[in-house]
């Protein structure tokens, strides 16, 4: 009997040590975001010609990196290279649009069907008014166990560190490209970090945001220069409204084969169906609201 108790104690102790180790690793783990071109599968942009970047711009990028990552030279270099490459791509553009995905934060706009249609719609509207634009992804997490833990921790704290990272990138662009307009796009949980960035950059009149389907527990801090959609005009967004009964009922029907899930239509963290939690340019209400927002803020034709 005593040996069994000792064995049980050993098992419990090992479990506690394992959980403690995971907890310590999760707390210390922090993944740097990647702002990248569409279609590159998350690879950071490459700086074609460093000599074409003014020295003052390069120095400011280094200063920002040190402020964010301290003496971690690898992270600093990674951050600086991204900043300067994006600066080089954006310096002759009128608009930069940055997509913040929902789910766990590692999806791309080209694999998010609803927002891909919206991106194309916005780009077309800007182009028809004679504006040039650069469309980017911002991947804030990696697809791994620690990546999930890090994302969950950030989500709970309102993306305190990840929002500062992204806000620094945007502030850098708008400082060194004075006529540039930046539109932040946030889908579902990505709307939380988008709102947090807008709060940090509340006084930056060059930055705007479009958010769709923010979670029901999140209350937007900043509404100036911001469009928040919680209804696609077809079905009320059950996730934004916290309509748990609709979510549960819809998933039960799918579980027992009474309905078939449709790829790209309303899921939470890539797994749970949420009726109405999808936004497409083809939806007349979505198209109208976004087009109206663009025309009011940017005097589109």
Predicted regions and their residues:
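Positively charged n-region of N-terminal signal peptides that target proteins for export
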Residues: 1-6
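Hydrophobic membrane-insertion alpha-helices, especially the h-region
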Residues: 10-23
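Active-site catalytic motif of lipid deacylating hydrolases and related acyltransferases
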Residues: 29-73, 84-180, 258-280
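Short, surface-exposed, polar/charged, turn-prone segments marking secondary-structure boundaries
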Residues: 125-127, 161-163, 211-213, 236-241, ...
């Amino acid at each position: 009997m005593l040996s069994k108790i000792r064995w049980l104690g050993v098992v419990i102790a090992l479990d506690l040590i394992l959980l403690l180790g995971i907890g310590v690793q999760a707390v210390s783990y922090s993944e740097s975001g990647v702002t990248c071109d569409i279609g590159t599968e998350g690879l950071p942009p490459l700086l074609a010609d460093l000599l074409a970047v003014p020295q003052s711009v390069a120095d400011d990028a280094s200063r920002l990196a040190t402020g964010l990552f301290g003496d971690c030279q690898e992270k600093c270099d990674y951050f600086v290279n991204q900043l300067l490459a994006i600066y080089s791509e954006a310096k002759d553009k009128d608009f930069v649009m940055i997509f913040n995905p929902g789910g766990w934060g590692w999806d791309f706009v080209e694999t998010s069907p609803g927002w891909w249609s919206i991106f194309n719609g916005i780009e077309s509207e800007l182009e028809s008014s004679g504006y040039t634009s650069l469309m980017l992804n911002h991947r804030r997490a990696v697809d791994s166990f620690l990546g999930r833990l890090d994302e969950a921790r950030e989500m709970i704290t309102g993306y305190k560190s990840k929002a500062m990272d992204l806000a620094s990138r945007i502030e850098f662009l708008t400082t060194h490209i004075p006529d540039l307009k930046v539109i932040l796009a946030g889908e579902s949980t990505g709307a939380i970090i988008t709102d947090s960035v807008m709060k940090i950059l509340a006084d930056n009149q060059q930055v705007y945001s479009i958010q769709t389907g923010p979670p029901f527990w999140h209350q937007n801090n900043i509404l100036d220069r911001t469009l928040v959609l919680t209804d696609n005009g077809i079905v009320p967004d059950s996730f934004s409204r916290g309509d748990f009964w609709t979510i549960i009922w819809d998933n039960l029907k799918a579980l027992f084969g009474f309905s078939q899930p449709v790829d790209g239509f309303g899921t939470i963290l890539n797994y749970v169906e949420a009726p109405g939690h999808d936004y497409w340019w083809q939806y007349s209400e979505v198209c109208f609201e976004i087009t109206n927002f663009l025309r009011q803020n940017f005097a589109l034709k």
